[in-house]
Swiss-Prot record:
Keyword Cell membrane: yes
KW NAD (keyword) present: no
Name of the protein: ATP synthase subunit alpha
Family that this chain belongs to: Belongs to the ATPase alpha/beta chains family.
Molecular-function annotations in GO: ADP binding; ATP binding; proton-transporting ATP synthase activity, rotational mechanism
Catalytic activity: ATP + H2O + 4 H(+)(in) = ADP + phosphate + 5 H(+)(out)
Enzyme's top EC category: translocase
Required for activity, annotated site positions: 362
Subunit structure, interactors included: F-type ATPases have 2 components, CF(1) - the catalytic core - and CF(0) - the membrane proton channel. CF(1) has five subunits: alpha(3), beta(3), gamma(1), delta(1), epsilon(1). CF(0) has three main subunits: a(1), b(2) and c(9-12). The alpha and beta chains form an alternating ring which encloses part of the gamma chain. CF(1) is attached to CF(0) by a central stalk formed by the gamma and epsilon chains, while a peripheral stalk is formed by the delta and b chains.
CDD domains the record matches: ATP-synt_F1_alpha_C (cd18113), ATP-synt_F1_alpha_N (cd18116), F1-ATPase_alpha_CD (cd01132)
Alphabetized InterPro entries for the sequence: ATP_synth_asu-like_sf (IPR023366), ATP_synth_asu_C (IPR000793), ATP_synth_asu_C_sf (IPR038376), ATP_synth_F1_a_nt-bd_dom (IPR033732), ATP_synth_F1_asu (IPR005294), ATPase_a/bsu_AS (IPR020003), ATPase_F1/V1/A1_a/bsu_N (IPR004100), ATPase_F1/V1/A1_a/bsu_N_sf (IPR036121)
Amino acid sequence: MNLRPEEISSIIRQQIEKYEVQVEVTDVGTVIQIGDGVARVYGLEDCMYSELLEFPGGTLGMALNLEEDNIGCVILGSYLHIKEGDVVKRTGRIASVPVGEALIGRVVNPVGEPLDGKGPIKTDRFRPIEKIAHGVVFRSPVDTPLQTGIKAVDAMIPIGRGQRELIMGDRQTGKTAIAVDTIINQKGQDCICIYVAIGQKASTVANVIQKLHEEGAMDHTIVVVAGASDPSPLLYIAPFAGAAMGEEFMEAGKDVLVVYDDLSKQAAAYRELSLLLRRPPGREAYPGDVFNLHSRLLERAAKLHPNIGGGSMTALPVIETQQGDVSAYIPTNVISITDGQIILEPDLFYAGVRPAINVGLSVSRVGGKAQRTAMRQVAGQLRLDLAQYRELAAFAQFGSDLDRATRARLTRGERMVELLKQGQYNPMPLEEQVMSIYTGVRGYLDSLPADKVRDFEIEFLKYMRTEKPEIGEDIKVNQKITPENESKLKAAVEEFKQMFVTQHGLS
């Protein structure tokens, strides 16, 4: 092999001509204290609030306290390898998450990293997790219903698209069940759902995800998970990440449902971070801005004006109460922020009334305007009647000498309570809800034993689906009960009741 000197010198000359000194200027700081997931960093004088900072090993942190001589930074991951004296770099990026269609059907953590083993999220679109909510002029009134598929909710506490409806109750009273049923019921409704699990056990979240898969609901759902074992900063940012993902679809003119399950754990995580950052504690040791924490999150739910797309984002925040105490700090905060609340009671739950909704305390402040006409026709007085029944039932325990009208009201109320019971993962279409409630409010169940009401409903709806499908179809198309259709429905109910009474030997 012959080496020619002129070739070698030519190559060296080319390399020298191409040589370029590249100097990268990076703003760096130094870790002066680390512990409990919080780092104090000296330097970084131009750092922004909520900016992501890079620690050794690629671990990211988020700047939350900008003080005179140092920065309080929470670590978004493991901090065990970080030590005093380590160099910290600015990234120049505010905390952001990936957004867009690529996330639908996926399970991700609060920074958008996949947790489902299906490969990376293929999207080039990102959004900051924090964003100022749309102003009044960009919003329009809530006027379209969001059907939950749950009779008790759709009839008495209707939810509209763009509303914030709080679900509140003690542990193990069915809060998540209502939220998951609502997500399942959005199948085919052109509504994208985001389920944000905050501080829950991994087994609980896995069960929810499995159920969503079984019901075919993951095709329109994104699941954001910050588990009980994750660092507090991830629990703190998880709801904001879910809101950012939802806003992307809302601003594209689509309807979105976001479930925050639950915000009590986010508030506890924020309290932990605030105390570690040496912020002054207030009531129940929460920081003074914990109200703002939830208000700036929930205000992002909106029904946008048609001029800017007309999309909507509905929020269903969940709050866990202790021993039914709805007057505690976080529950009262969120009640005052939201447009209504669904309150669940353990006593009703253990008595077999499921969903265990306390009709007297639950309310929807704006959803009534969005309720379908058909439902309003049959359920207009239902909420008031049930509240009166509860009072009468409590009074009737102390004496049996009741007049006929009171006994009739108790009989009707008892059967309506039975009628409104509904199994989990069994959402019901609007037309079937309307026909079912019609049988109760028109008195067709009064002469039946209370323990036969559920059987009557199941068999009646099966009969209507097979023998009289045109009645339900008319309600579905017109969204109301026309006089002609009501006469058909009345005849069908009377005909079926006669068959049911004969079949079960109740005559």
